[in-house]
């Protein structure tokens, strides 16, 4: 059975890792099992990322996870969703300090930034990291934030005028809306 890529991501990969996370947190799954599943799926997602070709002129989107956030599947899946929406997604991986994220945004001349926030309890650094990113990239840069840990930073997300996306469909809708609006401004 062949599924379209977005359906595969939304109906297989995302629920799979949600369930793996639940099992790990409840102690029913060993860390080694979670890591093994992660290696297999990460490799598959990387292959999918490399297989997609996007025009050089497509708007650039930096995708990463902030410092302290090591779970990268939300970011990888977001990068794939963005590529399929016509963006040149530039994936920089997990655990990046705000200064490095800002450097990537500026160096790559990104049109937008996507941050994946994993499940993280009591992450005292994250709100400050998000504020630093917003100050450095300016008020006009769209920042999309998603992932299981986004509930812990909803107030900060509102303060920095970030777009909180609750799932891949909402993320793709936001990306496509942004592209339409940018295109309308040019004409």
Regions found by a protein language model. Give the residues of each.
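Short, acidic/small-residue loops that bind anionic groups at enzyme active sites
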Residues: 27, 139-143
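Peripheral docking tails and interdomain loops at the edges
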Residues: 144-187
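Conserved mid-sequence domains
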Residues: 36-135, 142
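Short glycine-enriched loops at secondary-structure junctions
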Residues: 14, 66-69, 149-150
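Short, structured coil segments at secondary-structure junctions
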Residues: 85, 139, 158-161
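Short beta->alpha linker loops
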Residues: 12, 96, 121, 148-149, ...
